[in-house]
Structure formats: structure tokens, C-alpha cells
Curated annotation (Swiss-Prot):
Domain of life the protein comes from: Bacteria
Organism: Trichlorobacter lovleyi (strain ATCC BAA-1151 / DSM 17278 / SZ) (Geobacter lovleyi)
Subunit structure, as described in the record: Tetramer of two alpha and two beta subunits.
Co-factor: note: Binds 2 magnesium ions per tetramer.
GO cellular component terms listed in the entry, alphabetical order: cytoplasm
Sequence similarity: Belongs to the class-II aminoacyl-tRNA synthetase family. Phe-tRNA synthetase alpha subunit type 1 subfamily.
UniProt keyword Disulfide bond present: no
Co-factor requirement: Mg(2+)
Name assigned to this protein: Phenylalanine--tRNA ligase alpha subunit
Gene3D superfamilies, sorted: Bira Bifunctional Protein, Domain 2
Reactions catalysed according to its record: tRNA(Phe) + L-phenylalanine + ATP = L-phenylalanyl-tRNA(Phe) + AMP + diphosphate + H(+)
Length: 338
């Protein structure tokens, strides 16, 4: 058995030396040291030897097993190190190569305008107020002095949900809710989404508005003009011309449309401004006394003004966008310009 053990030892050492990968070394391990391995078989055969030879032969078998196992482990570690070194050599990072830039998103032009308008009015002492988009008829129409027969109540203009609930057609209901909760003075803007049954190059069934309200004692039309002139000059530039034209809104009296000098032609007249030199940007006026009565304010002691603008229209004028539908198409080629 001694000769057989030495022969097996030499064979195992030769097999280990010939192995170049972890897989080959594992095969050698199984062949000699596994449950059915050759060295394991010798250990099981010790029982057939005379009793006086068993300890010596058993010690020799264990010595060979330890030697083979240690050499396999040593060779395995060396094979792993060589494989790692080879992989590192082929996967080496060239730190001189330029880095890959991350794709950066940008804010939507509507969001940019809302933030800029809100910041301007914050500087004028206005705070932001919000309200529900599904609104009750009373807040959206009646409290704002819209009589039941007013055309804005027609199905072609308003999305009715059920009974007296509807999708708000403007953010004016936020003004009503604020005045019902808060006594004068009031100075708020109400940005938000509104809905109307209309869709073409300059209209959308869903769009955004910012409306404003200022209520206090002795608020005058001159205050309204001063606030809006300051706003337009900050938004479009200090040299932007501003004019107010008489108009009509059920919830304000007197009412006005606010125009700015055409941002395309500078007021000289072009296709965009229809040769007038002016572009309408918002509506405004002094709050009608009837609206104050609806919210429990005394129109004899307080006064105020309100104004409202479409954010998409402001964005189109500010960024030179010709079709409002571009703002809702989610075309990255368009949006990444902002």
C-alpha cells in the first residue's frame, strides 16, 4: 500500500501542476479528496491491514491528503490572482478619456412662468392661495356675480361634473374662499389649473391661470394700475409700454383689459399684434360691491381690485411660441430649449 500511496501522490501533484484554472483544480480535488476520491478510498481500506501497520499507513495517508489539499489551495489562490490581474489589464479604465455627461432635465415653460410671476408678486407683498379644481357652482359663478343666464354657464364653455359641481373655469373661486375665511386686508395670487370647452392653436381645454386680489380700505384704481405696471415691467422689461382699455367682467366694475407693447415689433405693428402695436395679456378691475356682499364684506368701508392672466399666453409672448399646443405635447425637442 505504501507504493500505491506514493504513486497516487505523484499523480496528484502532477495533476495539480497541470491545472491552470479553478475548474481544473476543483476536478483534481474531487478526484483525490472527494467522498469517492482515490485518497479517501485508501483511508477506507485501512481496515484490511494488520493492526500493527494501520497507524503508520494511516498517518502516511493523512500526510499525503494534507499535502495535496494544501497544494490545491495554494495553486487555487495563484490562479485566482492571475485571473484577476488579467481581467484588470483588459478592463483598465483610461482616466484620460472625457467623462460622460448626465442628461439634465429642465422645467416646463409654464412652470417657469408661474414661478417668475409668483416671485414678482411676492416682492409686491402678495401671498399664494390655492383651492379645489372641482368647484361648486356658487363659488365659480354666483358669488362672482354671474347671473344664472350668463353664457359662461353654457355647456359649450364649462365642464359640468354633476348637479352643481363643475371643473372650475377660472381661479377666481379661490378669491371667494379666501375672503370668506379672512378679513381685510387681503393680498393674494391664485395660480392653478382651469378648464373650458375650447381647443385650437391659441386655446386649450385645460390651461393655467394666475389671478390676484387686493382688498383693503381706500384701495383705488391707481393702485391697480401701479401694481400691474410694475409687474409687466419686471416680466417683460422696464421699457415695455403698458395701456389699459375699458372692458367688462361680471365681478369687477370698472373693468379693464391690460395690453403691453408688442414684444415682436416693439409697438410698430406686425402680424402678431394685427398691426395695432399692442398685445392683450390680462384682465383686471375694481371688485364689484356685489361680490363683497356675497362674502360678508362691507363695500362702504373697503375696496379692492382683482386681475387674472393666462399663463400659457404669457409663456407664448415671453418665449415667442406660436402654437399653444406645443406646451402640451411633451415633445422633448421643444421642451429642452428652456
Amino acid at each position: 500500500m505504501r507504493e500505491q500511496l506514493e504513486q497516487m501522490r505523484q499523480q496528484a501533484l502532477s495533476a495539480i501542476a497541470a491545472a491552470t484554472t479553478e475548474e481544473m483544480l476543483n476536478e483534481v480535488r474531487v478526484r483525490y479528496l472527494g467522498r469517492k476520491g482515490e485518497l479517501t478510498g485508501l483511508m477506507k481500506g485501512l481496515g484490511s491491514l494488520p493492526a500493527d501497520e494501520r497507524p503508520k499507513v494511516g498517518q502516511l495517508v493523512n500526510t499525503v491528503k494534507d499535502e495535496v489539499e494544501a497544494l490545491i489551495e495554494q495553486t487555487m489562490n495563484r490562479a485566482r490572482e492571475e485571473a484577476t490581474a488579467k481581467r484588470l489589464a483588459t478592463e483598465r479604465i483610461d482616466i484620460s478619456l472625457p467623462g460622460r455627461g448626465r442628461r439634465q432635465g429642465s422645467k416646463h415653460p409654464v412652470t417657469l412662468v408661474i414661478e417668475e410671476v409668483s416671485e414678482i408678486f411676492a416682492g409686491l407683498g402678495f401671498s399664494v392661495a390655492e383651492g379645489p379644481e372641482i368647484e361648486h357652482d356658487w363659488y365659480n359663478f354666483e358669488a362672482l356675480n354671474f347671473p344664472p343666464e350668463h353664457p359662461a354657464r353654457d355647456m359649450q364653455d364649462t365642464f359640468f361634473v354633476e348637479n352643481e359641481l363643475l371643473l372650475r373655469t377660472h381661479t377666481s373661486p379661490v378669491q371667494i374662499r379666501t375672503m370668506l375665511k379672512q378679513k381685510p386686508p387681503v393680498r393674494i395670487i391664485a395660480p392653478g389649473t382651469v378648464y373650458r370647452c375650447d381647443s385650437d392653436a391659441t386655446h386649450s381645454p385645460m390651461f393655467h391661470q394666475i389671478e390676484g386680489l387686493m382688498v383693503d380700505s381706500q384701495v383705488s384704481f391707481a393702485d391697480l394700475k401701479g401694481i400691474l405696471t410694475t409687474f409687466t415691467n419686471q416680466l417683460f422689461g422696464q421699457k415695455t409700454g403698458v395701456r389699459l382699455r375699458p372692458s367688462f367682467f361680471p365681478f369687477t366694475e370698472p373693468s379693464a383689459e391690460v395690453d403691453i407693447a408688442c414684444v415682436i415689433c416693439g409697438g410698430s405693428g406686425c402680424r402678431v399684434c394685427k398691426q395695432t402695436g399692442w398685445l392683450e395679456i390680462l384682465g383686471a378691475g375694481m371688485v364689484d360691491p356685489e361680490v363683497f356682499r356675497h362674502v360678508g364684506y362691507d363695500p362702504e368701508t373697503i375696496s379692492g381690485f382683482a386681475f387674472g392672466m393666462g399663463i400659457e399666453r404669457i409663456a407664448m409672448l415671453k418665449y415667442g411660441i406660436s402654437d399653444m399646443r406645443l406646451l402640451f405635447e411633451n415633445d422633448v425637442r421643444f421642451l429642452k430649449q428652456f
